[in-house]
């Protein structure tokens, strides 16, 4: 596979070298040069590495000079077309061509009496050089190229005679459309405030276009240009409103909405105009008063009900409604009067689109105050005298105004109910988390206290434990058990110390005050009894050796209010029921191994091993094991252990601090320069996958030892210094 790729790459390089030689030695043959340029364009389009290689062998600069110096128009057109395609394919070629000299040459082509095709190719090259390139946006303004583009925008086609069936008119329209697209990239992506300020001088001409022609071929480019020039620039938005642009857009939107009932294309085109209106009022909600004169809200609601629109188009309409009603009570009332609020609630409850739901919530939030005012009475509605008279006239014409008020109350109640449900869910979630955390802390403190009392009375517990014939495994709450599952070493002692029955009696007698203080903990245990019963029944028999019905008895006795009485009654019933079962004789075997292995031959080594392997240690032997573990832990920390001089036959695990001591120094990696193929792989990978360095590393055959961070550093280095090819 690699040999085939290498062979194709070599063939591509050979072809480009031959084609470049053909361009150089066929200066008198315009047709041959055109064919060679078209072939170069085709090769560069098929192989992304071809553009890089063509730039390296000097072909890019030769074609640039050829476009300027050739006497044949067809060669100039082909050369510009090839330059644009190569720059569009490779960002480094774009940066190489992005010079003031080339912009001046392109400006001369556009200003001179050149044919339509040459001007189109010149505009195409400008479009490619400016797109996603702030340097290109600056040069297109400083060289005066944007001035020539503005003049072409005004004069290429006539506003009154637009017959696209005519071949000459259609070619002029194609040039005008390319100019619109180029102006769009001059002002946006990235946003350029200075170019936006310059292009706003074209707004009056754009308004004339919208007034005289409502065909999609004109409205779509004009709306794209206006929307991108207005975007995120409040000064330009104010200027657009001052020259009557918002009024013109409103009139066009009204006409398209009226036509949308008959043609689907009008509905789609109305959405395009709606997006442009939204771009104008998004940062200045007060401009919504202009839209209220044309009752745009009612038109948008009617357009929203159009069945042919998808969710994205409906979202644009709803977002525009939100900006219209954000700071304009007239539009809010218009929305309410045209049953817009029920429509928003229906969209909120039925739609599964998250963005659509957010837009509907935005509209409902804007209309909350006006809904409250209308739900009270007409007299309390705070409009001036003229507006009050208007409302009275409306009430005369509409006999069902009371029905509107009733709907307003219902809608307001529904909004408050939705908000209240959301707040209650949030409060319940926070209370649940607080209860869980407080319960876990209380239970852990209780176990620590009980464990300390149990160790202090170890000898007494041993005497009492020997007089009884069974052991009862106590249960733990969900919080402690989850901790025991995740960290066995930390919870080893509490699990072992929870076995003896009489230890529970002693703890109940001497910790009565503690149980009373922890009554809230007992209540939490009562709430999780069902979970504990299931959890205990599924646990390992090696740890829990009590019968299954113990959990049932506990559940029945939990309602007792006194914690001490609760614990005593449960233990008494468990002891009586347990001694009566046949398993009593079997449970006698579950005793401390240190107590029942007296007759066996034991020494210091096997006795310690026997105690550590026993899950049922008595208090005395448990204290012995803990003391031995502490002693051995201190021994491991001593100087002898750190020097790896071990007195025990078994090798223990190295201490954690040993790995952090400065010992060996990591071996430095051998430097490997990036080859040409690796650089090509890197560019191709970034183009296809973006900045996902791991994916690029595994997708291409880089040298052994390459890492993702190497690719990232190399790409950023090439971006800043394109001349560095391999380092």
From Swiss-Prot:
**Does the keyword Transport belong to this entry?**
no
PTM note: Phosphorylated by CDK. Phosphorylation by CDK takes place in late prophase when the cap exchange is prominent. is important for the stabilization of telomere attachment but dispenable for the cap exchange.
Any Pfam family matching the protein:
Myb_DNA-binding
Name the UniProt key words of this record, in alphabetical order. Chromosome, Coiled coil, Disease variant, Meiosis, Membrane, Nucleus, Phosphoprotein, Repeat, Telomere
Record-level GO cellular component terms: chromosome, telomeric region; nuclear inner membrane; shelterin complex
Q: Which InterPro entries match?
A: ARM-like, ARM-type_fold, Homeodomain-like_sf, SANT/Myb, TERB1
Write out the ranges of the annotated region (Interaction with TERF1): 523-662
The cross-references to Gene3D superfamilies, in alphabetical order and at most eight, read: Homeodomain-like, Leucine-rich Repeat Variant
Q: Where would one find coiled-coil regions in this protein? A: 398-446
Return the Basic and acidic residues bias intervals: 457-468
Residue ranges of every copy of the Myb-like domain listed in the record: 666-719
Give the GO biological process terms.
double-strand break repair involved in meiotic recombination; homologous chromosome pairing at meiosis; meiotic attachment of telomere to nuclear envelope; meiotic telomere clustering
Q: So which domain of life are we looking at?
A: Eukaryota
- Where is the chain membrane-spanning? none
Q: Which residues carry this modification: Phosphothreonine?
A: 648
Q: What does this protein do?
A: Meiosis-specific telomere-associated protein involved in meiotic telomere attachment to the nucleus inner membrane, a crucial step for homologous pairing and synapsis. Component of the MAJIN-TERB1-TERB2 complex, which promotes telomere cap exchange by mediating attachment of telomeric DNA to the inner nuclear membrane and replacement of the protective cap of telomeric chromosomes: in early meiosis, the MAJIN-TERB1-TERB2 complex associates with telomeric DNA and the shelterin/telosome complex.
- Disease / disorder: Spermatogenic failure 60: An autosomal recessive male infertility disorder characterized by non-obstructive azoospermia, due to sperm maturation arrest before the pachytene stage.
The UniProt subunit note reads as follows: Component of the MAJIN-TERB1-TERB2 complex, composed of MAJIN, TERB1 and TERB2. Interacts with TERF1, STAG3 and SUN1. Interacts (via Myb-like domain) with the cohesin complex; probably mediated via interaction with STAG3.
The name on file for this protein is: Telomere repeats-binding bouquet formation protein 1
Q: Which organism is it from?
A: Homo sapiens (Human)
